[in-house]
Amino acid sequence: MKFSTFVSLGLTAITALAAPTPSMIDVKRDVVKRAASLEDVATAERPLRCRPSASLPPPSRVTRLPLFSSLVLSRALATTSRSAATSPSSDRTARSCLRTSPSPSRVSRMLSFVTLPSRRSSVAMLSPSRRYELVTPKEITTYLHRLQSENVWVDHLDLSSDRDHDKDYYDGLLDITHAADFVTVTNTFLHDHWKASLIGHSDSNGAEDKGHLTVTYANNYLKNLNSRGRPSASAQATSTTTTTRTCRMVSTPARVRSCLFRTTFLSAPRRLFTRLMLDMLLSLATTSVMARTLPRRVL
């Protein structure tokens, strides 16, 4: 083989090595493109317990916080008037509530959110709840602590803050609390934060959480986190899961499967940490290519 052929092959190899690979920045920009459609339902591990009713209004896609707030308020007022006129004594169902700072809290019913505002200067929090007495917007704030959400699908989100402040400056990125049930978190990127994701929030409300907090985590990417980097809870929940991989660090039915943990520090006793490491090694042994493929596929 001629020397020129060797040179040509060498240059080709160098060019291939120098070619840029997909980075997390590229992946983050592709979140909306790869997100589920408005008609999809979660199917990871276990589908949500019920599909959206045919009577629900069509979902709305918003990208700016003012439009988001006005949409929530308008549908909350319409739902309040309709509910009061039809069945004033029934146990009504509120689908979601939005809290924006410094705006007052708003509760909306039968409203589906796809794209959340991304402005870091504002705080947008969705707290779906199923037990609200919808009376007037002023009185709605009285019921903000009755958070018993169920049938919630969190899909294709990029959640982060920064690590420039101390651990108590921010709270959790994605917390599932107050007897929430049948919550599915898929294809979500949690990164650059102190407290990542928590299931259950306190030992003092064990009676509220018992028998609830059924949460599925699938195909998520956790990076550069300090604590709560795995589903962890102090709530007294009853484990009812029968799926292939179960996080047994706590008594919460949280399923963890095909999730990648990188530069993440787990705050757990040594005995529990050892059990988690054995579970992770077993999972990696059965899916040896996960660490190479998941970062490009997760979002």
UniProtKB/Swiss-Prot annotation:
Signal sequence, renumbered to the chain: 1-18
GO cellular component: extracellular region
GO molecular function ontology, one term from the record: pectin lyase activity
Regions of compositional bias (Low complexity) in chain numbering: 82-91, 232-246
Top EC category: lyase
Subcellular location as annotated: Secreted
Catalytically driven reaction(s): Eliminative cleavage of (1->4)-alpha-D-galacturonan methyl ester to give oligosaccharides with 4-deoxy-6-O-methyl-alpha-D-galact-4-enuronosyl groups at their non-reducing ends
Descriptive protein name: Pectin lyase
Organism, as annotated: Peyronellaea pinodes (Pea foot rot fungus)
